[in-house]
Amino acid sequence: PAPGQPALPAPQQEWHSQLMLTAMIAAAKADGHVDERERSLIEAELQRQQADDEERRWLEAQLRKPLDPADVARAAVGQAPALAAEVYLDSLVVSDDTSFMERAYLDELARRLQLPAALKQDLETQARSG
C-alpha cells in the first residue's frame, strides 16, 4: 500500500497486486512487444511482491495472451477512484508513451477508467518527473 494507507486483507492484496501487474503488462505490450526495460520493471514489481513460482507462471501466461485497455479498466471501474488513478500511473511508468501505439493504448485506458482530463494530466506529469 501507499505510505499512510492501511494494508489490504490478503485476498484483496492479491487481487490488487494482480491488477497492477496486469496494467503494467498490458501497457508494456501496447506497441506489440515487451522490451528489456519494460520487462525489468515488471520483474522488479514481481520481486517487490515476493512472487512465488505460481505467480511467475501467471506472469508468463499474461505476457502471451492479448490484453486490452477494456479488460484492465473493467477490473478498476466501480472501485475507489484512487484505484483507477493507480492503474493509469502504473501503466504510464512501464510504457514509453512516445510510441504511437502505446500513446493510443494509454489514451484509451484513461477513457475507459473514466479519468478526468486534469487528473490524467497530473498523473502523466507525475510519471515523467519520476
How should each PLM-predicted stretch be described?
Residues P1-I25, E38-G130:
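Small-residue-enriched hydrophobic alpha-helices in membranes
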